Amino acid sequence: MTDTIKIGVGGPVGAGKHELIEKIVKRLAKDMSIGVITNDIYTKEDEKILVNSGVLPEDRIIGVETGGCPHTAIREDASMNFAAIDELKERNDDIELIFIESGGDNLAATFSPELVDFSIYIIDVAQGEKIPRKGGQGMIKSDFFVINKTDLAPYVGASLERMAEDTKVFRGNRPFTFTNLKTDEGLDEVIEWIEQYVFLKGLA
């Protein structure tokens, strides 16, 4: 069975987790074997959306219903996600990369290091310029940080320059990028990080 790298994608509701995964998969699926696990509180809506998008065959997507605490399912008790990983591997024994999308949660949510090898945390500009200054653990500890919906900055009075400065304060040299996933702006930086950092380091 192929070694499988697992990347967790977390962030608040509506930040763009699902869209980011869909865009990445669309770019990478032709060159590698990929699966996706979605976490929703009471439904499997994200699983249905991803299946309907056609970016992956249905047998490469599994939806997990987490119940009331989505962060518990990716950290304190990740048993449902571990089971989903095993099921994806049984269905596709060549699988190289699995994305695990967390349910929408607060800035403190982080993935268990036993569940994922790397993590991406995404917020959006519409949540306010101050969000990076709050320094939540999801933003601080993630391997890659994404600030999405840059096109909304003028409408919410947010300075991207200030957000970048604040991000550098709490992340230091850890990578981050701005994106507008509607136009794919910034997507290349995320793909480059996966191809050059995740796979080189994860398979070392």
From Swiss-Prot:
Keyword Cytoplasm on this protein? yes
List GO molecular-function terms, semicolon-separated: GTP binding; GTPase activity; nickel cation binding
What's the superkingdom here? Bacteria
Query: Which compartments does it reside in?
Result: Cytoplasm
Q: Quote the InterPro entries the UniProt record gives.
A: CobW/HypB/UreG_nucleotide-bd, P-loop_NTPase, UreG
**Keywords for the protein's UniProt record, in alphabetical order:** Chaperone, Cytoplasm, GTP-binding, Nickel insertion, Nucleotide-binding
Residue positions annotated to bind GTP are G11, P12, V13, G14, A15, G16, K17, H18
- One GO CC annotation, please? cytoplasm
Keyword Nucleotide-binding among UniProt keywords = yes
Q: Name one GO biological process term.
A: urea catabolic process
Q: Which Gene3D superfamilies match?
A: P-loop containing nucleotide triphosphate hydrolases (3.40.50.300)
Primary location recorded for the protein, binned into one broad class: cytoplasm
Which family does the similarity line name?
A: Belongs to the SIMIBI class G3E GTPase family. UreG subfamily.
What's this protein's function? Facilitates the functional incorporation of the urease nickel metallocenter. This process requires GTP hydrolysis, probably effectuated by UreG.
> What subunit structure does UniProt give?
Homodimer. UreD, UreF and UreG form a complex that acts as a GTP-hydrolysis-dependent molecular chaperone, activating the urease apoprotein by helping to assemble the nickel containing metallocenter of UreC. The UreE protein probably delivers the nickel.
Q: What is this protein called?
A: Urease accessory protein UreG
Native species of this protein?
A: Staphylococcus xylosus
Q: Which gene encodes it?
A: ureG
